[in-house]
Amino acid sequence: MEVRVANVRKEFERFPALHDVSLDIKSGELIALLGPSGSGKTTLLRLIAGLERPTRGKIFFGDEDASQKSIQERNVGFVFQHYALFRHMTVADNIGFGLKVRHGSSRPPAQEIRRRASELLDLVQLSGLEKRYPAQLSGGQRQRVALARAMAIEPKVLLLDEPFGALDAQVRRELRRWLREIHDRTGHTTVFVTHDQEEALELADRVVVMSQGRIEQVGTADDIYDTPNSPFVYGFIGESSSLPVKVENGEIWLADRPIGLSAPHAPEGEATLYFRPHDVELLDGCSGCIAGTVAASRRVAGTRRVELEIGGERQRVEIELPVGHPAAQKSRVAFRPGRWKLFPAA
């Protein structure tokens, strides 16, 4: 099922939570809505679900305008962060609940509901636990039950609101891989909300980066990480460092000296240079480079993060070195960014 969000604005008591947002989601696609708190990602998910109505604009499921339809009429499956399982029901009854409460001819026979629950238990790798209650399950198992319940109604669209947010890091990593496998097997159009960029980049076919009620960028993990289109995206996705620079005659200058980077197509004047801490070339001398005094150095897993003070204004940047690299022992380090991007000064 294709989903199209067309020029949607959402206000809460005149406070704009979304500003004229448009987004096309392809049938069978796994989409991540990624952003900090207050970015509008959960509001957008709830609008797609039918839990909220747009102040302006429309939401289409296929060619049909679903803007004023309820969540039941849209036939979406919704998975909450905190599972929302019924404590007094067994696993099998929780999974079959959405089918049991259907009315009239749309309600399957009890035998069909049991068959569907058993089939989904196999899919989510919980066979043999159908008679247990939620309190007898781990957090990861409860989230699998919640996903199976959402899929039981054979939804047109599957929506997940920070589905792994309440779980510890190891379980989250395992469930991410599992969810991707489930999606590839079932082919549901799936949209999930997360503030965890690693989760979004690993899982999604495309990532929608949001900030302050607007979409900043939509693209694959490679697009978002390697070619961010705004200072916000560059700073929000992955680790980054930045320096105020200026462009003169197609060359990038830091303070009163060129740093060996050419920008022939960049506009002249003040700009901000962004680069990744791990993507730098270390240099012995500094004829056309960036040099700084080591202000701090710390071990981060298999690397060493070095904080440098640059220039008279003591602008600070971070670079990343292998743990045993001799440059980490120096008081002064010279480098040049490998991949980088310029944005006009704010």
UniProtKB/Swiss-Prot annotation:
Q: Give the NCBIfam families listed for this entry.
A: 3a0106s01
What EC number is given for this enzyme?
7.3.2.3
State the function annotated in the UniProt record: Part of the ABC transporter complex CysAWTP involved in sulfate/thiosulfate import. Responsible for energy coupling to the transport system.
Alphabetically sorted, this entry's keywords are: ATP-binding, Cell inner membrane, Cell membrane, Membrane, Nucleotide-binding, Sulfate transport, Translocase, Transport
Span of domain ABC transporter? 3-237
Which gene name does the record give? Answer: cysA
Tell me which SMART domains the record gives: AAA
Question: What's its top-level EC category?
Answer: translocase
Q: Which family does it belong to?
A: Belongs to the ABC transporter superfamily. Sulfate/tungstate importer (TC 3.A.1.6) family.
Subcellular compartments: Cell inner membrane
Binding-site residues, ATP: G35, P36, S37, G38, S39, G40, K41, T42
Q: How does it assemble?
A: The complex is composed of two ATP-binding proteins (CysA), two transmembrane proteins (CysT and CysW) and a solute-binding protein (CysP).
**What GO cellular component is one of the record's annotations?**
ATP-binding cassette (ABC) transporter complex
Name assigned to this protein: Sulfate/thiosulfate import ATP-binding protein CysA
The protein's topology relative to the membrane is: Peripheral membrane protein
Q: Name one GO molecular function term.
A: ABC-type thiosulfate transporter activity
User: What highest taxon heads this organism's lineage?
Assistant: Bacteria
Q: What catalytic activity does the UniProt entry give for this protein? A: sulfate(out) + ATP + H2O = sulfate(in) + ADP + phosphate + H(+); thiosulfate(out) + ATP + H2O = thiosulfate(in) + ADP + phosphate + H(+)
A Pfam family this protein belongs to? ABC_tran
